[in-house]
Amino acid sequence: MINFSNTLIILNNDVPCELLKKKYSELLIPTIGILDFKKKKIYKKYNNIFLYSYQNYSFLLDLNDNILLKIQKYLNKNGILDINLYLNDKSNNNSGTSKKDHSKIEDINKILKRLRKECLYNGYINISAEQTMSENGIVINIKAENPDFNKSDDDNNLVSSDEEIYEKCEDKKKVVNRVCDNCTCGKKEKAMNLEKIKINDNEVEYNTENVVSSCGNCYLGDAFRCGSCPYKGLPAFQPGENVKLNLNNEQN
C-alpha cells in the first residue's frame, strides 16, 4: 500500500497527463510537470516518485539533462521510482498486422532494455520492468529503488568479529628470535642473562630469575631446545629457579 502523503507525481506535458494532474490534485497529491521539475529546485525528499508520459520517452535518455539522476536526489533512501509510459498503437487497423506486431514487440523490448540500463547507470537497484496491453496501446512500467549504502548494525558487528578473529590469529603467531652460534653483537650474552655463582670447586649455581625465552622451549630441557639455544646443557628449570650443576658429573 503506497503512502501518498510522501509521494510526488511528475507528469509529461501532454493532454492525457493533464487529466491525470486533475485527478491527483483532487486527492491533494503534489504534482509537477517535466519542464518545471527540470528547472525548479525541490526542498523535500519523497518515499515514492511516479513519472507518467504518453508517447514521448526520449527525455529519459537525455544525458545532457539527466532527469533520472535528478529524481534520485529527491528520493529518500530505499525510495521507489515508478515510471509509467503509455505507447499508443496506431497499427491495429492496418494490413499485415502480424509482421508489424512482431516488429512492435521488438521495439518495446528495446525500450525496456534501454530504460533499465539507464536506471542502472544512474545508481538505482532492484530494477523491474514489465509491459501490459491496454485498450489502444501498451503500458511500460519500470520500478527502481534508490539504494541505502549505510552499514547496518549487523554489518558493523560482522566487521568487528572479523577484526577480532584477525587479532587472535596474529596473537597466536610466534616470533622466534634466534641467536647465532657465532654471535658478535652481544645478543647471545644478553639472552643468557644467567647469574653464575660458584659454590665450590665441584658445584656451580645458576640464577634464572631474568631468563628470557623467545620460543618458550628453553625451560624444557635439551630435548626441546634448538641447536643454538643459549641454555643448552642446563637441565629443565622454571623461571626464577636456581639451578645447581655438579661439575664432576659434567666432566664425566
From Swiss-Prot:
Region described as N-terminal SAM-like domain: 1-153
Residue positions binding [2Fe-2S] cluster: 169, 180, 183, 185
Lineage summary: Eukaryota, Sar, Alveolata, Apicomplexa, Aconoidasida
Protein family according to the UniProt entry: Belongs to the anamorsin family.
Entry's Gene Ontology cellular component terms: mitochondrial intermembrane space
InterPro entries given in the database record: Anamorsin, CIAPIN1
Co-factor(s): [2Fe-2S] cluster; [4Fe-4S] cluster
Statement: the UniProt record of this protein carries the keyword Iron: yes
Record's protein name: Anamorsin homolog
